[in-house]
Design a protein with these regions (language model features):
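Non-catalytic cap/lid and distal C-terminal segments of serine-dependent acyl enzymes
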Residues: 1-244
């Protein structure tokens, strides 16, 4: 049974008008236990924001690791996506990719930093995503290394178009990425084809390491679904947020 302390959480909804996307985008913001506007906090930005809260149970997990497992209190920002245009926004070959990444870095980040006491160092901003959300998080770091240096990727959809972009980078020694993929993800049917996610993640790990990135990489029994990712979220968050 879940400890009742983990269920008492503060989540705020915001709406941002994006000129890049030409529409409004909903943000869901988690504030940690003991939240105080006079303090400052690390921040985790999640792609597929609604799913991270609803299926990943990230707010409950955050409470638990902050209250009982030594995580530094942190803020979470979940960025909503319309599933019907998710691939267009998250994949580098998508027709909304440039607009989405610009919105994320140039509109969402300044909006949050103006309204909430989040820290502004690249080491205090973490990008998190599953599947295509993992790959677009890595793209964001490469596009805006002055903003992002830390990435959580769960079963990243590192298609060849993404790998070619990553491979073009010469020095990634500034990047730290936590990666996991499920061993049962060898033939996952995505909207653009069927892919061996284990091989995609191994190849991406190798090319990142060759360019100097700090990579924490794991393969575990699991499928391409939230039941797997939810269980791995605590370790992913603690990797970057454990108070030392």
């Amino acid at each position: 049974m879940t400890d009742s302390r983990y269920l008492k959480r503060t989540i705020v909804k915001e709406e941002i008008e994006s000129r890049y996307l030409g529409e409004k985008r909903t943000l869901r913001i988690y504030l940690p236990p003991g939240y105080n506007e006079l303090l400052s906090y690390p921040v985790v930005y999640c792609q597929d924001g609604e799913e991270f809260f609803n299926f990943g149970r990230i707010a409950t997990t955050a409470n638990r690791i902050i209250l009982d497992e030594g995580a530094e209190p942190f803020i979470i920002v979940g960025v909503q996506v319309d599933v019907s245009v998710r691939t267009q926004e998250y994949a580098p070959f998508g027709d909304r990719f440039k607009a989405y990444t610009a919105c994320f870095a140039e509109e969402i980040i300044p909006y949050i930093e103006e309204k909430y006491p989040v820290r502004r160092s690249p080491q205090e901003r973490i990008l998190a995503g599953d599947s295509l959300g993992g790959s677009v998080s890595l793209h964001l770091a490469l596009l805006y290394p002055d903003l992002f240096t830390r990435v959580i990727s769960m079963s990243g959809a590192f298609y060849s178009a993404s790998q070619e972009i990553y491979a073009a980078a010469e020095d990634l020694s500034w990047l730290s990425i936590w990666m996991i993929v499920g061993l049962q993800e060898t033939a996952f049917a995505a909207d653009t084809g069927t892919y061996d996610f284990v091989q995609l993640n191994r190849d991406t790990r190798d090319l990142l390491e060759k360019r100097g990135a700090l990579v924490s990489y794991q393969e575990k029994d699991g499928n391409h679904q939230w039941g797997f990712w939810q269980n791995e979220l605590p370790e992913a968050l603690l990797y970057f947020l454990q108070e030392r």
